[in-house]
Amino acid sequence: MSFDALLLLSFGGPEAPEQVMPFLENVTRGRGIPRERLESVAEHYLHFGGVSPINGINRDLIVAIEAELARRGRNLPVYFGNRNWEPYVEDTVKAMSDNGIRRAAVFATSAWGGYSGCAQYQEDIARGRAAAGPEAPELVKLRQYFDHPLFVEMFADAVADAAATLPEELRDEARLVFTAHSIPLRAASRCGADLYERQVGYAARLVAAAAGYREYDQVWQSRSGPPQVPWLEPDVGDHLEALARNGTRAVIVCPLGFVADHIEVVWDLDNELAEQAAEAGIAFARAATPNSQPRFAQLVVDLIDEMLHGLPPRRVEGPDPVPAYGSSVNGAPCTPACSA
């Protein structure tokens, strides 16, 4: 087995004010979201000049991946494609085909299973190949990596770094709170009996143990949609209120569900939640996401090596392990539950 290229596949984000509404319309197409709601969310992006950090971070990650590939003696071009904004995956796969790429690995910037974490990226792969036509390259998605040692290590170190920013007298009592993006309960049951929820919970256990925390909380954030539709709970804001009522004086919030600084991190946590904590008199620290650090690039190339050389997956073994799927060819479901 060999690869001619690597495709980094991500969510996408606007890079100018005039791109914000078209981007949000792409994200919510077919979901019947009222325009007033989109305009409200658009304000979050406009607070940052209409620029999501995600595309810039991914470009920096590609540079880091290229450096790691070179360090390991690999000559593998890295392409960049998105679901919801330029560069669109359809255009990228067409360019790969035009450049003579016949077989490529695909790294999705989601560590998780479930529909939005994995199966939707498989759909992106299939759509990209369809757009490229009969000469489209074979695309092999790399596995889910929430339990890779470097994933756990990066977040554990980020928790320690965040703790160090708190007042010294509060560090030992700070409550560790992991967050991940909430999804509707109906979606949570797709692709295998609450797989996403279980994977996030397992990764939280691994990171907490690596960071030296026996106790922690795992909550959800950034829900949207009609209030009558049930989503994964508890919500991080509601949880912070409960902590305040119980006398908590400091929190470390670790956005475990995000490998980069999405708007849900820099707005929902760094602005809204931080303000809520300040109003409650709680010292607040937010752990960094992996973004484009060299260890993240090493993780990506590790996944390629596993596939190329048939190596056993590098995983942190903890109690009650949860399956990691994600690897399949040309957008096919990687588990039977996702084909239902």
Curated annotation (Swiss-Prot):
Entry EC number(s): 4.99.1.9
Binding-site residues for Fe(2+), renumbered to this chain: H181, E264
GO annotation, biological process: heme biosynthetic process
One Pfam family named in its UniProt record: Ferrochelatase
Pathway(s) it belongs to: Porphyrin-containing compound metabolism; protoheme biosynthesis
Catalyzed reactions per annotation: Fe-coproporphyrin III + 2 H(+) = coproporphyrin III + Fe(2+)
Alphabetic keyword roster: Cytoplasm, Heme biosynthesis, Iron, Lyase, Metal-binding, Porphyrin biosynthesis
Subcellular compartments: Cytoplasm
Database matches in SUPFAM superfamilies: Chelatase
Gene3D superfamilies cross-referenced by the UniProt entry: 3.40.50.1400
Job of this protein: Involved in coproporphyrin-dependent heme b biosynthesis. Catalyzes the insertion of ferrous iron into coproporphyrin III to form Fe-coproporphyrin III.
Membership in a protein family: Belongs to the ferrochelatase family.
Protein name: Coproporphyrin III ferrochelatase
